[in-house]
Amino acid sequence: MCSSDLTMGAPYFKQKDLFRRAGVVCFSSNYELYADMSSRVMTTLEEISPRVEIYSIDEAFCDLTGVRNCRNLTDFGKEIRETVLKRTHLRVGVGIAQTKTLAKLANHAAKKWQQQTGGVVDLSNIDRQRRLLAIVPVEDVWGVGRRISKKLNAMGIKTALDLSEQSTWIIRKHFNVVLERTVRELRGEPCLDLEEFAPTKQEIVCSRSFGERVTEYEQVRQAICSYAARGAEKLRGEHQYCRFISAFVKTSPFALNEPYYGNSASMTLLTPTQDSRDIINAAVKCLDKIWKEGHRYQKAGIMLGDFFSQGVAQLNLFDNSAPRAGSEKLMEVLDRLNAKDGKGTLYFAGQGIQQQWQMKREMLSPRYTTRYSDLLRIR
């Protein structure tokens, strides 16, 4: 089976026969395991490099300023790779360059030609840099994507090298300042700083497709309560309070002979909160505004916004909406117990017990690193 046979993002059931014929082993999404292994990789990188930006769950940028003075960069990249492999048993690609955009391309090459490169590519050499840029399609450049690449192709810009040689004035005129920065980065001019601390989130969204179509209000309400509780937990992790809360529901837009229905509702609290009880209560009120019987719902979710760094807002003279007494201490206990004894140790009754609406993960691999019950047993 070759990659051209597969369609990215297509549902499993549509490609199940293809997988079976090719002997492909499939697993359900194991978010808990992914997050824990990601944390171990990032912790390892932070021990090796003085400055690290965690870009995503499986990607990070390391500042190697000054390393060249005492180490060969390719050797240092191999050391990073070997250390991560030793501690986590995960193979990573290492791309080294003067800018983030070039480092992403170097990483792309390290993964694509792993046998030839040993999983490490250093683009410090300008000639090597240009050779790689000449064979990389422009759509593979970080931040370009399909829509912009089509317009670039129409202008005769086919490769990353072609893009790097364009006038920044023309690129800015026909596109935007973001693509202009990409051109400069491809030339080795740093335009994107390393962000050691993630910027404060402007919103938090918690949503998931149901394991099967849901028709009962109670099941959707349980899902909304669970997403609201998770959103509140994330909010406290960001040391933020929110005032804006919304909930949404939708049916599948692809269902045959079924009318599509999707809707959302929101409300703004007078006093900012990070209390799960307030957020759950508001989210359920939003659900009640948009709930319609007779639909087979595919997905639901909540969004939190209008953040404050502390639970204080300007009240009117006759307002009587003080924060709950003991709220912060109670939420601290809730989060501490769930962190210590496992998620879901303490939960709100509104979240339900059996949760039949949960996403089906029938091929879930064990969560070896976070659950004692999933540890391997030696007989």
Each language-model region and where it sits:
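Short, hydrophobic beta-strand segments
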Residues: 60-66, 264-270, 313-319
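Short, glycine-/Ser/Thr-/acidic-enriched flexible segments
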Residues: 252-254, 307-309, 353
